[in-house]
A protein has these predicted regions:
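Short helix-coil transition sites and intra-membrane helix breaks within transmembrane domains
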Residues: 19-24, 54-55, 66-76, 104-117, ...
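Short amphipathic alpha-helical coupling elements at transmembrane boundaries
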Residues: 49, 77-87, 123-128, 268, ...
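Hydrophobic, membrane-inserted alpha-helices
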Residues: 8-14, 97-102, 140, 228-232, ...
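Membrane-core helix-loop-helix motifs of multi-pass transport proteins
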Residues: 123-218, 366
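Small-residue-rich segments of transmembrane alpha-helices in multi-pass membrane proteins
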Residues: 32-39, 91-95, 145-150, 289-304, ...
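Hydrophobic alpha-helical transmembrane segments of multi-pass integral membrane proteins
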Residues: 58, 88-123, 134-137, 320-367, ...
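Alpha-helical transmembrane segments
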Residues: 54-61, 143, 175-190, 255-257, ...
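Hydrophobic transmembrane alpha-helices of multi-pass small-molecule transporters
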Residues: 1-58, 66, 181-312
Length: 382
C-alpha cells in the first residue's frame, strides 16, 4: 500500500507541477511530509535527516561563484571573442556555435546561462550566413547541455551529489567524466554528419561573417577568468593525480580536501574582496527554483528508498528485463520522462536509486553504462 501511495505522490507532483506551474519540489516536500508523518511513523525532525544537504550546498555555492562571471559580463565577452576569431569559417558555423556553447557551459555558466548568452548570437549569425536558425539554436542547446555535464559545472555537480548519495563516492569522478564525454561526442557526430550533408547538397559559403570586434576584457573580467581557471585546476588536479598515482597517501588526502562547494565559496569571497561583482546581484541570480525542485524530489525519493519501493522496482527490472537490454530500457524511460519533467530534478533523482539497487543485486552490471544511458536519453528529449 505504501509503495503505491509513494508512486502516486511522485506522479502527482510531476503532473500537478506540469499543469499548474507550481514548483515540483514544493509539491514533493509536501507529499513527503504527509507520507512520512502519517504512514511511515517518522517525525518531522527525522524527515529532515533525508534532506540532501550536501547536494543543496554544492549547487548553491557553485552557482554563486559563477554568477560573478555572469553579472560582470565575463562569459558574454569571452563568447564574443571566440566568435570573432572564427568569423572566417562560415561553413563551420554550426560546429563553432556548438563548441562555444560547450566551452561556456563547461566553464561553469551552466545550461540556462549559456542558452541566454548564445541563442540570440546563434540566430543572428545564422541569418547573416544564410544558415538555418533552428539548427544553430539546436547546436547551442546540445552544447549547453553537454558542457553543463562537466563535473565542475551545473548538471555535473548535481550528478556528483546524486552519485555520492547512492554510495558511489569513490566512482563519482569517473562516472561524471563518462557522462560528460559521451554527452559531448554524440551531438558532435550528429552535427558533423548534418554539416557534411548541407555542405555537399547546397555547396560552400566563401564569404566571411560580419561580426563587430568585441571589447577587450577589462581588468575585472581578466581577474574573473583567472579565478574560474584556478577553481577548475584545484578541483581537477588531485582527482586526476589520484587516477595516475592511486597509492600515494598525500594525493588521496588532498583529493578529498578540495571540495568544489567549499572551493567555490572561497572564490566568491575572494571575488567580492576584489570587487569583481555586486553581492546583491550575485545572490539574486542563485537558481532557487531548480535547487528546491531537485532537493524536494530527492527527499521524496529518499522515502521511496526507505520504504523498500526502489529495491522492489530494481528487483522487478533485473528479473524481467535481460541485462543486455537494460541500457536501452533506461535510455528510453529517461527520454519519455524528460518530455514532461526536468532531467536534473526528476529523471536523475528517480532513476539513479533504481540503478543503485540493480547494481547491488547484480554487481557485474556496469553502472557507468546505465547512468550514461539515462542521462543521454533524457538530454535527447529535454
Amino acid at each position: 500500500m505504501i509503495h503505491l501511495i509513494i508512486i502516486s505522490a511522485i506522479a502527482l507532483a510531476i503532473g500537478i507541477g506540469y499543469r499548474t506551474k507550481i514548483n515540483i519540489g514544493l509539491l514533493a516536500i509536501a507529499f513527503s511530509y504527509l507520507i512520512a508523518t502519517t504512514l511511515m511513523g517518522l517525525s518531522p525532525k527525522e524527515l529532515l535527516h533525508f534532506w540532501p544537504t550536501s547536494l543543496f550546498f554544492t549547487i548553491f555555492s557553485v552557482s554563486l561563484f559563477y554568477n560573478v562571471a555572469t553579472t560582470n559580463g565575463t562569459l558574454d565577452v569571452l563568447a564574443q571573442h571566440i566568435l570573432y576569431r572564427t568569423r572566417t569559417h562560415p561553413n563551420a558555423l554550426y560546429m563553432i556555435l556548438y563548441l562555444i556553447a560547450t566551452l561556456l557551459s563547461a566553464l561553469g555558466a551552466g545550461f540556462f546561462t549559456t542558452m541566454a548568452i548564445c541563442c540570440p548570437l546563434a540566430i543572428t549569425l545564422c541569418q547573416k550566413a544564410d544558415k538555418h536558425p533552428l539548427i544553430g539554436a539546436q547546436a547551442v542547446n546540445w552544447g549547453a547541455s553537454g558542457g553543463a555535464n562537466l563535473i565542475t559545472s551545473g548538471s555535473g555537480i548535481v550528478f556528483q551529489g546524486l552519485f555520492k548519495q547512492m554510495g558511489w563516492e569513490e566512482q563519482a569522478f569517473s562516472l561524471g567524466n563518462h557522462i560528460f564525454i559521451v554527452s559531448i561526442i554524440y551531438p558532435l557526430i550528429v552535427l558533423l554528419l548534418l554539416s557534411c550533408y548541407i555542405r555537399y547538397s547546397k555547396g560552400r559559403t566563401n564569404s566571411s561573417l560580419t561580426i563587430d570586434q568585441p571589447p577587450v576584457l577589462s581588468k575585472v573580467q581578466r581577474q574573473t577568468t583567472l579565478l574560474m581557471i584556478s577553481s577548475m585546476v584545484l578541483v581537477w588536479l588531485f582527482p586526476l593525480l589520484h587516477l595516475i598515482f592511486p597509492n600515494i597517501a598525500w594525493i588521496t588526502t588532498y583529493r578529498q580536501t578540495f571540495d568544489i562547494g567549499f572551493v567555490s565559496i572561497l572564490m566568491v569571497c575572494l571575488a567580492l574582496r576584489l570587487k569583481l561583482g555586486k553581492q546583491e546581484a550575485i545572490l539574486a541570480k542563485v537558481p532557487w527554483a531548480i535547487i528546491i525542485m531537485l532537493c524536494g524530489m530527492s527527499l521524496l525519493m529518499s522515502l521511496a528508498v526507505k520504504s523498500g519501493l526502489v529495491t522492489l522496482i530494481g528487483h522487478l527490472i533485473t528479473t524481467t528485463i535481460p541485462h543486455f537490454w537494460l541500457p536501452l530500457f533506461f535510455c528510453v524511460i529517461a527520454g519519455v520522462m524528460s518530455l514532461f519533467s526536468s532531467t536534473l530534478s526528476v529523471v536523475a533523482p528517480t532513476l539513479f536509486p533504481i540503478i543503485a539497487t540493480i547494481s547491488a543485486q547484480s554487481p557485474h552490471i556496469d553502472i557507468r553504462l546505465l547512468t550514461t544511458a539515462t542521462i543521454i536519453g533524457a538530454l535527447s528529449t529535454n
